[in-house]
Amino acid sequence: MALGGALTLAPLPAGPAEAAPARSGRRPTLRHGSAARAGLLPSHLRRLVADAETFLAPSPKHPWYAGAVLLAGRGGTVALHRPIGMAVRYRAYDEKTDTGVEFPPGEQIPMAEDTVFDLASVSKLFTSILAVQQIERGALGLEAKVSSYLPDFARAGKQDITIRQLLTHTSGFRAWIPLYGAPTHEDKLQLIWTERPVSAPGAAYLYSDLNLISLQLVLERVTGRTLDTLLRDEITAPLGMRRTRYNPPASWRPKIAATEDARAPWSGLDRGLVWGEVHDENAFALGGVAGHAGVFSDAWDLAVLGRTLLNGGVYGRARILSPESVELMFTDFNTAFPGDEHGLGFELYQHWYMGAMATPRTAGHTGFTGTSLVLDPTTDSFLIVLGNSVHPVRSWRSGSAPRVAAANHMARAVPVRPARGRTAWFSGTALSTTATLALPALDTSAGRARLRCALWWDIEPAADVLVLEASADGGTSWQPVPFTTFRRGQHPEQHPSGSVTGWSGRVWHGLTADVPAARELTLRWRYTTDRLYVGRGCYADGLRVEDAGDLLFDERRPADAARVQAVGWTREAD
């Protein structure tokens, strides 16, 4: 398929948006249902909510958010849709005491399932979808230069920046500039035209609001429609997203989560409590309609958008993208910048907010106001966390701990069934830990012993590691044991370091390892994690050690199983 006459795709295998639904040929629409119906574990969804509620309290000094709406599901089932905390709590921020000035209790508004949020940078996904639609239709070229649509854009060294580089944040633009300081719309445009990139196009990854503001200008030029009209015509109306728009009307205000008491010096504009208007200063100065921020929506509407993409661009009778276009949004274009994986508009494989849901195909985005969307095509699951974390002031929150905690629980809610039998050994997902699974000492002195088992791993790449080790001196010293893994339809993979990290496809692998010769040899798995993030963890099943046909160890034998020493590992059915 040729998109915009610039990028030609060879026939694609079933991509992330196709994978899960394609097995049954279904393209589900959403409805509420039980965790069991969704194929999720209810205990972990309950823990997701409980953990999210802890961030309503000081964490550590102030609440991370005043409230949130949590939505999680799999396939066509929304198994969790829970409001917590307050949508409107504070009328002001007292910088002298670093406290929030609360509304009287009768004027505070609790979160509801349909509370509408200022999405902040999650808005970038809508702009990106609109751009990919135009690429698909041939009105926009993915590798075309931006200046071919906007001649003024060519100034100040920007003449070679492409549409793809805007979508993947590799244009060279700095993070942002204060457009709100320019008095007129034309003056704001002049700031963009005269802005000089800080790096050559394609030379570095640098996340920038200017990329999506520029893309807005391109879209409006090639379509002859404003961005808010495009959003309505091309996305929200076809998908029935009735609570998603720019510039919500005043009648929506009681159902909108408040954001910040915006005043200098922490805000670029003195506006007081921002409630029902876009929080971002540049988007506000652009009339509330901007490519980088300004969209308001609720959790259900975002779930519909996510389900549409996981369906390959279709929801019910409405198709907004082709499957090939969705594939481009979920495919990493930033292979030259490891750690900054990015599809067209979507961020990929970002543990810092996707937590254990992160895979090379997991797509999502966050917003400064406390919002996030995560889509995992490998498990056909989705998670939305909408919080008002700048209420009453942006300095009260830092990091993405609530997003990570929610994603970790959501990932754990997707069961991993044992390769054999009813249970398998599971490493857990604790931070800053070393979990070990040790077999009893075995006599392998004949030199023919071999370990066989099934292994499943999803590990934060590079930072965390699973190692197979052996000790011949009672555990005083350990040496790595090289091994080979294999799965049906693929060539065996050698692991000469005796270790694995990263993502294995979330499938079971067979494993064999030649065991060192020793009179008393102890084998163990060691899973080590750092203090920041974890993957879904590791599973081992069917552990057995053979010596020329003789079984030295088989965990299916109760006597052998009883001699396994597990620290941090547990037997789990899922």
Give the location of each predicted region.
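Beta-sandwich/jellyroll recognition modules and their flexible linkers
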Residues: 46, 328-333, 358-361, 368-372, ...
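Short, conserved phosphate/pyrophosphate- and ester-handling motifs at nucleotide-, phospho-/glycolipid
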Residues: 41, 124, 298
